[in-house]
Regions:
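Phosphate- and other anionic-substrate recognition elements at nucleic-acid/protein interfaces
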Residues: 1-159
Length: 159
């Protein structure tokens, strides 16, 4: 069974674990939204990624379930909600089972509650040194989050 971990949002990421090992991690595919400099999730490319990885209804998609955050603003939350909906829609179209996990659950499992965003990147590099080149920049913390979301399911529910 493959486990897909998704950190949703425009700056999010997608990871795939096979037997507990990372087989793929990429930034969330995006595209321009109209003529503005804003971005949106590229649903077609997300579909391509999941299809190329041979993700099927026998696998699991673990999607971080987030809610409104103080100070984010209405426009930002609406945009985030759209991104979340696109991800769920792609998974539904591909008939992939989606399991939602709250950030507090997976972060607590890895002792990352109230830690810096970059702590997840450090944790993944310690656990999977072979992936360090994929996580060399601070912005790669979202990739690390996607990996840990999948790993959380693997360690707690997916065995």
């Amino acid at each position: 069974m493959k486990i897909v971990g998704i950190d949703p949002g425009i700056s999010g990421a997608i990871s795939v674990l096979r037997d507990g090992n990372i087989s793929m991690v990429v930034d969330m595919p995006t595209m321009a939204e109209g003529t503005k400099s804003k971005k949106q999730i590229n649903a077609a490319e997300l579909t391509n990624i999941l299809t190329k990885e041979n993700i099927s209804h026998e696998d699991k998609v673990i999607l971080e379930s987030v809610s409104a955050m103080p100070g984010q603003g209405v426009t930002g939350m609406f945009s985030f909600g759209q991104s979340f909906g696109v991800i769920k829609g792609v998974c539904a179209a591909l008939k992939l089972p989606v399991i939602l996990v709250r950030p507090v659950k997976w972060k607590k499992h890895f002792n990352l509650l109230n830690s810096e965003k970059d702590a997840s990147r450090t944790k993944v590099i310690e656990t999977y040194p072979y992936i360090s080149s994929e996580l060399s920049k601070k912005k790669d913390a979202n990739k690390a989050d996607a990996i840990l979301i999948a790993k959380y399911y693997f360690e707690t529910l997916g065995k």
